[in-house]
Amino acid sequence: MNRERYLQEIDAVNAAGKYHPTWESLSTHPVPDWYREKRLGIFLHWGVFSVPAYHDWYARNMYIKGSPEYEYHCQHYGQPKDFGFKDFIPQFKMEAFDPQAWVKLFREAGADYIVPVAEHHDGFQNYRSELSHWNAAEMGPHRDIMGDLLVEAERAGMTLGASSHRVEHWWFLGHGQEFDSDIKQPMHLGDYAWPAMPERENQDLFSEPTPTDEFLTDWLLRCCEIVDRYHPRILYFDWWIQHSAVKPYLQRFAAYYFNVMESRGGCVINYKHDAFPFGIGVPDIERGQFAEAKPFLWQSDTSVMRGSWCYSVQPDKAVYKAPQEIVQDLLDVVSKNGRLLLNFGPKPDGTLADKDVEILHKLADWMRVNDECIHGTGLWRINQEGPTKIQEGQFADGASRNFTSEDFRFTCRGGNIYAACMACPTDGKLHIRSLREADASHLPLWHGIVRKVEVLGNPAQAAWTRDGEALHVDLGDYQSDMPVVVKIITD
């Protein structure tokens, strides 16, 4: 690829297009209506890191002397100077990859968009690229695995996305230069480990060494190549794009992305840490959520495993969340005007782990009954009641969330209210205090009429009463290890 010519094309599109590389211009780009209908997405952390099956930062940590990953690597594969991270690439074969089967599982689980990792911090591209030979079409699987997956997802009616974690590659392999390893100078643009810069303690807005124009131009071209090759309608950026040096390149990319996708129904950027000014794109919280409902759209991305984003066999990493907890997260996020991007880590042979499949089947079973409280719904006047409080912020999904039968999340649709009980009561009795009888006083309490109450998934007529304390619903013999949804028909 002629890089200079590609840059000229990018700038020409931005000069002639509706959107220009300024925050003022980019802030006029709306979130498309189709995105407002999304509720559940599938995130896929796949790549070379799935071969050692440790966790997704293995490529960095194996070059930190004394780290658990370094010790593990030396014990199982030898010294990094003899067997580096790049030497895992031939074992990343994806020989059993069946994208059609994957997409079928995702759709049955209620997912309506998909975001595979295009390139992670390690610098290996999971798609066909003309900017680097270190990609899945030329090495490892020798297949455009992302392209093949997106084709099947589009056929199944899923909205296509992609994620870029490339910018952290600036320093991700830098520790490999601190001792005798396979990462050494000279390194040049196009080399796998390049630039492998020193990693400072504070990787944030103004951390040094500052990314160079050469590196950030390469970042820009890689992002634009993903757009031009696959036209993803959602592009997710991981952290560190908030760095001050990245901002002009973010503007150029966002303008190009918005302009290219303008005739294709629009697009959305997911970002973290206020990398974009508020109102441009959709903010994302990693492994966490907000404590209260928000008037703006937002996203929570989390993984089915607590200790890793990628496939892992390490006992302290491959700790799976229970399906009940995942559904509770979905209900909590949707009730607060959010979307849940749920991550799975495929195996290096292209299959999904048995536990992943089990979770997807459990989600499918629950969504088959309760989808109407998720898709097509909006915010109710309150989003929650109950004693259990969510710890707000990122990396909070390890905090205890012992939901009780007194905890509810609310959505509404077509004049109906949906009250999801986060933990099915053992005595079969629900007491929804937000729907109690109330007078028309100055207090902002709900004063509507309840005509009928249904328990989704329970064919029996629900017995219910309403008084000044609560709406009381008797589930009878109905029991479930998953959240139970009550549909309240109002007038």
Walk through the language-model features, giving the residues of each.
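Mature catalytic domains of secreted/periplasmic carbohydrate-active enzymes
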Residues: 1-491
